[in-house]
Amino acid sequence: MDNWITARLAGTLRSAADPLVVDLGYGATPVTAVELAARLARVRSDVRVLGLEIDADRVAAAMPAADPPRLTFARGGFELAGERPAIVRAANVLRQYDEAAAARAWLTLRAGLAPGGVLVEGTCDELGRLGCWVLLEQGGPRSLTFACRVEAIERPGQLAERLPKALIHRNVPGEAIHEFLAAFDAAWDAAAAVSTFGPRQRWIAAGTALARSGWPVDVTRTRHGELTVDWTAVAPRCSA
């Protein structure tokens, strides 16, 4: 997720009046916030990363890693501690919520963004091999990105287990996300011959095939094991 943010949201960060980025729910250790700050500093030297946790003990434990003003930590949740960040990163934060509560959290987080700001919300496995995230602007979701270590998957459909809360229960017949994942698996299967050159080339070929068949996908970062699809192509169709 961090590499994608650095590459795809560099323009958002560079144009921000206040280059504040929030790492929401960084966890038991501040590693993700530390790494995010280091990566984003290469995009904009005056970036400020604020790690937020609702657990005061986690905030206290992170303090030795603080490097103000570049990296700070505070207690806070979906209200973003009253800040107006240009970018919010929320990884593995909403999985424990039900779909309705997660939708409310999206609304709260989007309302707290600075003008032109974005929210990146999603999940990944413990080893960072499989992940999915949604890019949201103040007006709503814009895209869904699938990411993996291509050597770790047998088919792209495995990423369904990492879908964000808004979609994870929608991977059923009649829903757009189900159709997209079926098409992705079919494109992967059709690219079997390319696997001679490695799984990365097979992933690239599958993404290219999806684009050619009319799916609104961005294949710019397929060489990195990522594929982004417009939210309109996968958004929920049926009432929860």
List PLM regions with ranges.
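Class I SAM-dependent methyltransferase Rossmann-like catalytic core
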Residues: 1-19, 23, 28-30
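Class I SAM-dependent methyltransferase SAM/SAH-binding core
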Residues: 27-80
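Short, conserved active-site loop motifs that form the nucleotide-linked donor/cofactor pocket
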Residues: 70-72, 86, 117
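A short SAM/SAH-binding and catalytic strip from SAM-dependent methyltransferases
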Residues: 84-103
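A short glycine-rich, Lys/Arg-flanked "PGG" loop and its adjoining helix->strand segment in the class I
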Residues: 95, 103-115
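Conserved beta-strand signature within the Rossmann-like core of class I S-adenosyl-L-methionine
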Residues: 113-128
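A conserved mid-domain beta-alpha-beta active-site/ligand-binding segment of alpha/beta enzyme cores
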Residues: 132-202
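Conserved Class I S-adenosyl-L-methionine
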Residues: 176-240
